[in-house]
Amino acid sequence: MAKKSAINRDLKRRKLTAKYAAKRAKLKAATMDEALSMEDRFQAQLKLAELPRNSSKTRIHNRCEITGRSKAYYRKLRMSRIALRDLASRGQIPGMVKSSW
């Protein structure tokens, strides 16, 4: 089980990312827009740099929703391999059975 602080930190980053996503996209588009003057593009870049660091999507780390584990993470299921195996062996995931051949 991961530390509660690590899980909470990641949740906080996800909330900040969602909050600033539109503003960040708008400023990023302005910095790339060739039609704008260099001064306007530079001002957009400065405003982008003033946004909170944790509002960037690259700062989010995928974590298991059950255990908080960050490694061996399945994106589609949003859980780690260990939690997946545990739930599957208990029969709590519909349609998932242990393979045998």
From Swiss-Prot:
GO (cellular component) term, any one: cytoplasm
GO biological process, one term: translation
Coiled coil start-end: none
Entry keywords, A to Z: Ribonucleoprotein, Ribosomal protein, RNA-binding, rRNA-binding
Single GO term (MF): rRNA binding
Top-rank lineage group of the source organism: Bacteria
Record-linked InterPro entries: Ribosomal_uS14 (IPR001209), Ribosomal_uS14_bac/plastid (IPR023036), Ribosomal_uS14_CS (IPR018271)
Listed SUPFAM superfamilies: Glucocorticoid receptor-like (DNA-binding domain) (SSF57716)
Annotated PROSITE patterns: RIBOSOMAL_S14 (PS00527)
Recorded family membership: Belongs to the universal ribosomal protein uS14 family.
Subunit composition and interactions: Part of the 30S ribosomal subunit. Contacts proteins S3 and S10.
HAMAP family from the UniProt entry: Ribosomal_uS14_1
Described function: Binds 16S rRNA, required for the assembly of 30S particles and may also be responsible for determining the conformation of the 16S rRNA at the A site.
NCBIfam families from the UniProt entry: PRK08881.1
Protein name listed in UniProt: Small ribosomal subunit protein uS14
Designated gene of the protein: rpsN
